[in-house]
């Protein structure tokens, strides 16, 4: 009796198993996916394909149809993965190449698209709509204006540090810059980016030297910046980028000169240079892009070593929704260590509007962002940034970008003797607005 019960249990389990997992072979999968594809039932194509792959059934038409199904559903990450598997089986089918090319483009994988299109015939390029120039080349011009939330916040400035302590304190008032950059593909695998920026900053400066105090309500600093980077597409999905950022800083410095029993203040024109170099590796997985960046810099007469870990997620397999984070560790030779966290959430709100929300926290003083492109080498400290970005593709050739950031600053009196403690800590807030035009060519 016991063996009979065990046999019945095994029979029920077997029936349940076969009911849940229909028996498939290459022929039945071919027939079912073809029928579903002809009727436009893309969900059924994907469902059947997943079941077949789970049972070890894999062939060209299956991957090809699954790629088409995901493509029509707007999941270009999954579409590119299946098209590429089909491409590895048969790389001579022109229509497959066309689908794979546009899946790469719509997924934002421009380098993969360039390398693939380099092997197209002229007839296939014309038929697939591949542009004569490599996709991703552009010229950009941007303008920025930064100003405090409370424009009178320096009116009540007081410093109780004894005059015997030499040092200075800066409070940022306005910041304006213009930036022009060009991105150019030199070959299917190699691209370069070069930009020049001119920046003007005004600060409230309080300085003490040899028992005298100097106040400059509109202290001016001017910067010229050159940024250069090159990106090499190593293998499918992987890019290696190296670059450098050079900053020339012009400002005035007062010093007290003794002449017998009397003295006078002499103003010197000073030119300093800040610089950094970086190396970055990025790899694109389906639905996830990862990046690691190492930055070595010398800013404000200090050496910095910075490491960035970046993760970006595309849950829909396209650019309609994405989010991610950048985790930064910054070490300075003065023994200072800082952790910075930046969060990003973006997506497509309208057919011609993408929006992004950005939140950053951590001491940004002497830190760099976005592969060394943005450098925070001001004398005060930004401790938090909350902002947004609006991206408006006006046409295939023109894109408008608008950025806004609400920033929290922290300023202290810095003694020249680094062994002394910083004093007179002040907190204030500012707005930063940037507008940019990008011409694609």
Predicted regions and their residues:
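Transmembrane beta-strand segments that form the barrel wall of outer-membrane beta-barrel proteins
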Residues: 64, 139-147, 164-166, 192-198, ...
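Residues on the lipid-exposed face of transmembrane beta-strands in outer-membrane beta-barrel proteins
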Residues: 180-184, 228-232, 279-283, 309-313, ...
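Long amphipathic alpha-helical scaffold segments
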Residues: 107-143, 154-160, 164-167, 176, ...
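Alpha-helical protein-protein interaction scaffolds
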Residues: 20-134
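Surface-exposed strand-loop-strand hairpins of Gram-negative outer-membrane beta-barrel proteins
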Residues: 147-181, 202-209, 213-218
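Strand-connecting loop/turn motifs
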Residues: 136-138, 185-189, 235-239, 283-289, ...
């Amino acid at each position: 009796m016991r063996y009979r019960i065990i046999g019945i249990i095994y029979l029920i389990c077997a029936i349940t198993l076969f009911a849940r997992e229909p028996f498939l072979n290459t022929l039945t999968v071919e027939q079912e996916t073809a029928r579903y594809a002809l009727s436009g039932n893309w969900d059924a194509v994907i469902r059947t394909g997943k079941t077949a792959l789970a049972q070890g059934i894999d062939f060209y038409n299956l991957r090809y149809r699954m790629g088409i199904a995901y493509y029509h559903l707007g999941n270009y990450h999954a579409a590119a993965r299946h098209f590429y598997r089909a491409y590895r089986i048969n790389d001579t089918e022109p229509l497959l190449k066309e689908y794979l090319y546009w899946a790469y483009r719509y997924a934002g994988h421009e380098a993969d698209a360039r390398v693939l299109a380099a092997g197209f015939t002229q007839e296939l390029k014309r038929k697939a709509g591949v542009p004569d120039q490599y996709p991703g080349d552009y010229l950009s011009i941007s303008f920025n204006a930064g100003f405090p939330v409370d424009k009178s916040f320096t009116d009540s400035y007081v410093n109780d540090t004894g005059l015997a302590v030499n040092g200075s304190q800066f409070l940022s008032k306005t910041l304006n810059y213009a930036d022009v950059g060009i991105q150019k593909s030199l070959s299917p695998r190699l691209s370069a980016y070069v930009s020049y920026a001119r920046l003007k900053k005004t600060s409230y400066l309080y300085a003490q030297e040899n028992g005298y105090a100097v106040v400059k309500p509109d202290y001016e600093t001017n910067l010229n910046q050159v940024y250069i980077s090159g990106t090499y597409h190593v293998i499918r999905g992987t890019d290696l980028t190296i670059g450098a950022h050079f900053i020339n800083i012009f400002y005035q410095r007062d010093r007290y000169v003794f002449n017998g029993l009397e003295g006078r203040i002499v103003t010197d024109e000073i030119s300093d240079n800040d610089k950094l170099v970086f190396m970055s590796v990025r790899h694109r997985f389906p639905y996830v892009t990862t990046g690691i960046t190492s930055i070595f810099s010398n800013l404000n007469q200090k050496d910095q070593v910075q490491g960035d870990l970046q993760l970006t997620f595309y849950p829909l397999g396209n650019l309609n929704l994405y989010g991610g984070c950048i985790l930064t560790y910054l070490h300075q030779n003065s023994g200072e260590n800082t952790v910075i966290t930046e969060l990003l959430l973006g997506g497509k709100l309208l057919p011609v509007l993408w929006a992004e929300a950005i939140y950053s926290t951590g001491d940004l003083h002497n830190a760099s962002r976005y592969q060394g492109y943005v450098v925070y080498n001001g004398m005060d400290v930004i401790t938090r940034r909350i902002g947004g970005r609006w991206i408006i593709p006006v046409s295939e050739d023109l894109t408008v970008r608008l950025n806004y950031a609400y920033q929290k600053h922290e300023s202290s009196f810095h003694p020249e003797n680094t062994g002394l403690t910083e004093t007179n800590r002040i907190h204030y807030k500012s707005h930063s607005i940037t507008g940019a035009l990008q011409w694609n060519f």
